[in-house]
Amino acid sequence: MRSTGRSHGPRRFLALIALPLALAVSTPGLASPSTDNAVAPDRSSTGEQNGVGLMRIVVADKSGIDRLNQLGVDLAEYTKPVDNGIEVHAILSPEESQALRDKGFDVQDAISDQGDYAQNMAERAAAIRAATATTAATDTLTVLRAEWFTSLDNQLFLNIEVKSSAGTDSTTVLTASWDGGPGTEIGSGGTATMSRFTDAGQYMYHRFSNPVPITAAPVKATITSNKGGSATVDVAKWLGSPRKNPGKHPYVSDFVDHYMDPTEVTARFTGLAAEFPRLTELIDLPYKTNGYRRQAQAQFGTAAASTVYVTSTAYGSEGGNDITVSLVNPGTTNAPLTVSVSGKAVTVRLATDGSGAITSTAAQVVAAVNGNADAAKLLTASTYRGNAGTGVVAAAPVTMLTDNLKAPASVSREPFQMKVLRIGKHRDGSKVGVFLYCQEHAREWVTPLVCVESAERLLRNYAKDPNTRKIVDDLDIFILPVVNPDGAHYSMYDYNMQRRNMTNYCPTSNADPGRRNAWGVDINRNFSVGSVFDGYVGASATSCTSDTFAGPNELSEPEARNEVWLVDHFPNIKLSMNTHSYGGYFMWPPGAYKAEGREVLPRVDQGTEAYFWTSSDYILSRVQEYRGTAIWPGRTGPVTDVLYSAAGNSADEHWYNRGIIGWDFEVGADIYNPATGRFSAVGFQPPFAEGHEEAMEFANGNIAILEVARAYATDKIQPKTSLKVVKQEVGATGFTFSTSEPANVYYTLDGSRPTYSSPKLALAGMREGVQNITVNSDTTVNWFSIDIAGNVESNYKPDGQGSNYNKQRVAVQ
């Protein structure tokens, strides 16, 4: 993948706010300089007055999301279809919210992530435009999914997804009706209009905006179109039954009781390694992070043209916080502008005219400070956000520089040593490896708890729980609890909505202390597959203050390189799970597309897609068994199908470069309120009581992933297939294959021996079943299948000379 050098193009969206307004926000700190130099950041924590909020935005379609990304808006990894478009969530200050409204965006109410949840935006009834029945062509309906499921408090829901052959016409309206259970009529259970889902201007399929609450599990559903099409299908149950009681030995769980910072999490893992040396080892990853540290700064001035800020050469923790700067009025006439240094005290004596008035401009002060060799060893001076600096500066008292960091002394200011806890009885590379990793995004406080809880359960249940013992004995498990430790510390103690790491690539025009909450690289946009540097959507390569800033080039960040090092150094890793929040998603590759023509990264083949879906049913059933949370079918699937494009994400990196089967959790499913009939989002940092429950249920999911991995590792059963004729008419016969388990089918139609180079059974389309193959004359079909674990049907050797493949003649009338 190509990389580019350091780039400092258009500034982040917040820079679009008028400069005088930005200065007005920080005026109190500028007008009254003090020894603590309290400069208000442009973006303050949610809990502060005029701080950022988690805001709803409704856009018409995915192109609106792409535009928000291009503007550098800080979007949550959350989307929800609504009747008039797509709802997304963004971290915005009041000024940023208004600036987006001025640009025509529908910025709506705030979602509290501190416990007081706002209701979801009101759904308006779908307007069905009448179509002339006599002129409308009858469309064909393909039902993609029809399922019912239960969630919290045993509330039942219905999910249906249908593709219409006339779906590209925005006037196509689909209506679903269902029965009320066995022996009841279609329609007795309810009727609902479906929403038309488009992405990047292309029709995808129709679905419900939200799963529909129902009172009884339906058996069948009928979908009708205003274009004349109709289809009736069976409604299946989504997710399985509860796990059986493990036996007389109680399964122990619940090992987290508060949100933990990365220092605490690492100490917990270090303690586990010491307590269980026979089953674990700690791996020090090779690339230390930049660390929870910043240069110290001070800012002087009340207007853009006369403002100067200084930045220490050393980090604040390494002496930068000991530097002082003063701007002195000499009190004499015709004084020259001079700079002097005594120890770590920098004194700027401002120039005056014949009347004794100060004449030094901001640009002149900057040049004088930077031109003084002794001062330049300590700090650099800059004008405010690229201003020419023609305004006259004001005198200021001795001011101490500060790095503005608030974490306690227990949080080191040195580069952070990331550690992986390796768990397994046999840690020699002979067992299938599974990589579980959490908190790529700093503000997602629940996610490291999922990794901690998973590790604790594996080790503390090993002695007495047979299922846990099988997992640990048969797998090689790698758990990285915090991918982004610097950003996570910053989120915990300085700015709760920090998403990125703390590395500042901004030029001086965006490096003043007011910008300090807008620096860093999005780790989950810094990988090398499907990246913004290759033209994919969902990250910024030019705005260093964008919350999806991908960095100066692919894999520029040590956090991302550590992930790559781990999976390269341990090639036995075959499966992975990346835990994020929020929204209740379960996803897999592909995760990115190019905007032009919605060019998606290559989709996985049908055998792998079937494996993802089959595994999902098992994994999500384990999530559900904790307290009833059901991950919606509409939030399950490839990232590009159910969320949006996320250029340069880690799951794509590991799948396309190494073939690692990887999933993404988004913990924190929306909570249904039966009193209001609405779903409420939980946010990044819910009250701990809710965060605890999310950690418990998704730790269940992690254990289930390990069970799936063990089944993969121990699978010696060969798949079985059969050829099924699905359609016969004069001159043509359509057929497909059915398999006993997720498997790829290779076939020939010319009588030749099938090999891995032969045509492979494909999917009929996005979220559809397998394709139908049509022949126009009597044809001998030869085929074999291979499952995900590599077992070949009938022990056939595709690269050999044997003939023990399947054969069947398909007749044509």
Regions flagged by a language model, labelled:
Residues R2-S34:
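Secretory targeting and sorting signals
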Residues S32-Y309, Y315-G320, R349-T736, T755-T780, ...:
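M14 metallocarboxypeptidase catalytic domain recognition
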Residues A314-V341, N370-A375:
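Ser/Thr/Gly-rich low-complexity blocks that favor extended beta-strand/coil architectures
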Residues S342-R349:
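Strand-loop-strand motifs at the edges of beta-sheets in extracellular beta-sandwich domains
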Residues T739-E741:
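Short glycine/proline-centered coil/turn motifs in the loop regions
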Residues V745-T748, W783:
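A short aromatic-rich beta-strand->coil structural motif
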